[in-house]
């Protein structure tokens, strides 16, 4: 996977905030958000139990509901 540390950090921050809002407000995203950012592609999936980001078919971040306040 060809992704620099700043890109990984931005995705981590985005997903952490998205998951915090999901836990606080109880919304769910039924369909994964698919994205293509040049050198990599993947999707974001949010459920009530966890949130994960998959880049180039590799799970790069997975957060369980209880790990975010």
Could you tell me what each predicted segment is?
Residues 2-31, 62:
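N-terminal acidic leader/helix
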Residues 30-69:
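Detector for the mature cores of small, proteolytically processed
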